Amino acid sequence: EVQFVMTSSGVLTSKSIQLDVGSEFALGDNARPFAVGRSVFFSAPRGSFTSIKRYFAVADVSDVKDADDTTGHVLSYIPNGVFDIQGTGTENYICVNSTGAYNRIYIYKFLFKDGVQLQASWSHWEFPKADKILASASIGSTMFIVRQHQGGVDLEHLKFIKEATD
């Protein structure tokens, strides 16, 4: 629950390395933090629900770190039990999987320009109640989903297309 900043005076060696506390933010135990661009997203349980926070370096001050609560406006949206956070900078999103809603994939879409967030939204994809999303991950513009359903387990993929028009 403590984030460290590693520094060194001169060449990095075992004698010159220094670790200083950079910040302190509570985080969940089950989902590994996930980096997209200059941000790292992580989960933090809050009551019966989970916050997803974005850890970042404050503009032009690389030693100062902070975290935004991306779910601050939807406090009761993602149930506890987050076990996976994945995403891609190609399409600017993260996906979150939770044991509290195995049949859903929560999606956080965002757009930054010149270090300023222009847009952000939370949504979810809901699969049949009996289904379980076991994993989801992205490579470029394609999301891969491992979904367990009554007929077995499938590896599925969805393509996101940047600059698509309706």
Question: Which residue stretches match the model-derived regions?
Answer:
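Beta-sheet-dominated scaffold domains
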Residues: 2-166
